């Protein structure tokens, strides 16, 4: 039945002269026999539909083919298959990849998965030689390889997107390093800062996000291929040869672990969740700042929407969607944790659920970054409104207390005296800047005329010289550190 003159082989020879889409049905029927030998009944349609994963794992076609090319090269080099057959397989796979990418070959949605489709196409083109590709390999270690290769590429893409956002933040921070606005705690005006300082807070968060992504990739960059289904293989394979071809730093130390864990997916989803936390917080502030209650910024028309009934509306929909989509990524992380928490070693079909979750997390983060970065880049900063807001709310009260500390008064006493002054101002409708000096001196005789310079907003910001603070010079240093970090970043 399995000889060179079998019905299957006759069909394959015939199919070589036909367009790819014509041979799909028969070819996938052939590949369905990969695991059918033990079974006496045909697969129910419901089972086939429920079991299939090609509709979401087909995005890994390039990684699947590239991994198979490396595997075939190794099989030939190690004498496990004839070198001439290895070369034919590699050439055939290369042609399949080119045909898919040119649009000449469509991935069959009726295939069980991308691995089955690729091997089926190869066998249709090469006959018996194509069937040798899967020697010393299981779909268990094959899919573990494909996911790692795919996610390494996606990490690089997301890191590049974050770097683009960081470049925009550094540019905006440089432009606004002297623009004063209120800093908030509990959403109450607290102390004066600069808009550049505020932007660099998010830059610091995103730098840590980049660090985490690099760290995830480092642990992910271990080759699982060669683990077999779970117990390795009896063939004299060279795993490190494959690792070198595919740019992996090492090979998995344990074959059970190599095929049965998806902690690298969970780690990536966790890192991406933190990216979304930071984007969501930033989005929340953008949404507030755009409102008439703040009016600190205005988004470009190209990154805003209107209302179907209220003609005056200009809505920050991108920021709102980023804030909302954070929940999707958190949900993807929860999905992965739930899938993996209760399955015994080694591979279980539950693990097929890993791909939709991690791919959704990846795609969502990329989509958000692609919209968020140009929104920030084109955003107009309403500097006068920021300054006007900083003039209210007694945000220079701490500086007033520090003035008394500089005169020798203990901080707690200085704090109490300043609190009394603020209470007076509230009762009389004044600010600390407009409160007469005699009222200052009635509370504490250490006050003198120079207190007005001390509590001037520009002075308040300029004298906050501690490392990481809001003064323009400090913001300059923060920008320089981020730029140096980006220059050295490994991805």
Give the residues covered by each predicted segment.
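Short linear loop/turn motifs
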Residues: 88-91, 256-261, 417-421, 456-459
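Glycine-rich cofactor/substrate-binding loops
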Residues: 32-67, 128-129, 310-491
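Charged, flexible cofactor/metal-binding loops and thiol motifs
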Residues: 147, 174, 182, 188-342, ...
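A helix-coil-helix interface module used to build multimeric assemblies
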Residues: 32-232, 237-244, 250, 305-306, ...
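Short, Lys/Arg-enriched N-terminal segments with co-localized hydrophobic residues
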Residues: 10-30
């Amino acid at each position: 039945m399995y000889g060179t003159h079998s019905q299957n082989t006759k069909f394959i020879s015939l199919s070589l002269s036909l367009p790819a889409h014509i041979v799909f049905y028969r070819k996938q029927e052939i590949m369905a026999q990969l695991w059918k030998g033990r079974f006496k009944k045909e697969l129910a349609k419901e089972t086939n539909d429920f079991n299939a994963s090609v509709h979401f794992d087909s995005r890994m076609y390039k990684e699947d083919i590239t991994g198979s090319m490396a595997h075939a090269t190794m099989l030939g080099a190690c004498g496990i298959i004839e070198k001439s057959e290895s070369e034919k397989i590699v050439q055939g796979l290369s042609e399949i990849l080119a045909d898919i990418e040119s649009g000449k070959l469509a991935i069959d949605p009726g295939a069980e998965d991308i691995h089955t489709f690729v091997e089926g196409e190869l066998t249709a083109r090469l006959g018996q030689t194509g069937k040798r590709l899967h020697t010393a390999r299981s779909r268990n270690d094959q899919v573990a390889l494909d996911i790692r290769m795919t996610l390494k590429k996606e990490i690089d893409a997301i890191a590049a997107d974050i770097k683009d956002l960081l470049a925009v933040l550094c540019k905006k921070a440089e432009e606004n390093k002297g623009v004063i606005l209120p800093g908030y705690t509990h959403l109450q005006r607290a102390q004066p800062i600069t808009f550049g300082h505020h932007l660099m807070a998010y830059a610091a968060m995103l730098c840590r996000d980049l660090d985490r992504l690099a760290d995830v990739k480092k642990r992910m960059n271990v080759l699982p291929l060669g683990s077999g289904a779970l117990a390795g293989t009896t063939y004299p394979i060279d795993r490190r040869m494959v690792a070198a071809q595919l740019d992996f730093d090492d090979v998995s130390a344990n074959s059970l672990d190599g095929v049965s864990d998806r902690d690298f997916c969970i780690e990536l989803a966790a890192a991406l969740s933190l990216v979304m936390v930071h984007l969501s917080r930033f989005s929340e502030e953008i949404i507030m700042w755009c409102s008439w209650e703040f009016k600190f910024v205005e988004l470009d028309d190209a990154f805003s929407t209107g209302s179907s009934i209220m003609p005056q509306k200009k809505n920050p929909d991108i920021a709102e969607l980023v804030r909302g989509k954070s929940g999707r990524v958190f949900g993807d992380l929860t999905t992965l944790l739930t899938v993996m928490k209760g399955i015994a070693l080694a591979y279980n079909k539950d693990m097929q659920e890993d791909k939709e979750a991690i791919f959704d997390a990846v795609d969502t983060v990329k989509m958000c970054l692609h919209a968020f970065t140009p929104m920030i880049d084109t955003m107009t900063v309403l500097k006068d409104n920021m300054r006007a807001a900083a003039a209210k709310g007694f945000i220079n009260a701490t500086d007033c207390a520090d003035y008394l500390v500089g005169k020798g008064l203990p901080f707690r006493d200085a704090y109490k005296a300043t609190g009394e002054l603020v209470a007076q101002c509230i009762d009389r409708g004044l600010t600390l800047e407009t409160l007469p000096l005699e009222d200052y001196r009635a509370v504490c005789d250490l006050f003198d005329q120079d207190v007005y310079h001390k509590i001037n907003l520009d002075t308040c910001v300029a004298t906050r010289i501690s490392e990481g603070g809001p003064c323009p010079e400090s913001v300059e240093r923060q920008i320089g550190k981020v730029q140096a970090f980006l220059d050295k970043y490994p991805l």
